[in-house]
């Protein structure tokens, strides 16, 4: 697999173009500020009534309504929640984007599942940093960058890949390394990872472990520490150096228990469930479910969110985290502000 770095990208390609970033959330604020600091001409497209307008202005960015911002752009990067992109694209972007411009995304969901069918005259690319927006920005400010993916869906100009690399470089990505993929692969692997491992799998594993201990009469506080709190310590070791690095760092007792019990808990039945989840993603069945859920204002997701919030692990966790002020001091998300 080829990895692209600074030497492989021509930053001048993007410096000569007008770029519009639609959205100013986690990724939007990072892309807009990084590209501006790289010497690019950047406009942010937002709703004037939105809370992000003043934040973008305070950062010294040119901010306009989406339709106006798009009309002057050579490159339009849409950085909105998946469910909001089709409406904004068809109402504000497609009627106003210039002939032969470049349309860019940071996730392939809407293009891959045909919720957005870009005009035939456009270059369509993806530039997807593999990290949250605050990390994309902070690494850039340190002189580094977050590894990124690029992909080309339509190449009408013959230069779409070069433009994607140039954009990634301006965003700091070629400092960390850029890997080429395609919209299908990025979308399907991203959804699978979220559903089977990172969000769905991890959350259910933590809750089930907590419930098993408390149902057996153990203190909820002990169950929280053993099944949720310490998970970060293990994940950090894997994140830093892989599974072998984690096993090197833990006790022999913990490692032996991993080998004996891990395959009993996460077993062939789990693998079959993962394969079924992947099949739903590959066939578009999951996408249809998510789109229909959105059209009915997310009744199932809202109900499950309430159930999760009411789970005993949330109550005991809140009490225990109050005993650890360093957690609040270093919070990644402050729900009172964002």
Curated annotation (Swiss-Prot):
Binding site for Mg(2+) 1: 190, 194
Main function: Involved in the biosynthesis of branched-chain amino acids (BCAA). Catalyzes an alkyl-migration followed by a ketol-acid reduction of (S)-2-acetolactate (S2AL) to yield (R)-2,3-dihydroxy-isovalerate. In the isomerase reaction, S2AL is rearranged via a Mg-dependent methyl migration to produce 3-hydroxy-3-methyl-2-ketobutyrate (HMKB). In the reductase reaction, this 2-ketoacid undergoes a metal-dependent reduction by NADPH to yield (R)-2,3-dihydroxy-isovalerate.
The protein's name: Ketol-acid reductoisomerase (NADP(+))
Organism: Aromatoleum aromaticum (strain DSM 19018 / LMG 30748 / EbN1) (Azoarcus sp. (strain EbN1))
Stretches assigned to the KARI C-terminal knotted domain: 182-327
Gene from which the chain derives: ilvC
Reaction(s) this enzyme catalyzes, per UniProt: (2R)-2,3-dihydroxy-3-methylbutanoate + NADP(+) = (2S)-2-acetolactate + NADPH + H(+); (2R,3R)-2,3-dihydroxy-3-methylpentanoate + NADP(+) = (S)-2-ethyl-2-hydroxy-3-oxobutanoate + NADPH + H(+)
The keyword Metal-binding is assigned to this record: yes
HAMAP family reported for this sequence: IlvC
InterPro entries reported for this sequence: 6-PGluconate_DH-like_C_sf, KARI, KARI_C, KARI_N, KARI_prok, NAD(P)-bd_dom_sf
Signal sequence range: none
One GO BP annotation of this record: L-valine biosynthetic process
Domain KARI N-terminal Rossmann intervals: 1-181
PANTHER family: KETOL-ACID REDUCTOISOMERASE, MITOCHONDRIAL (PTHR21371:SF1)
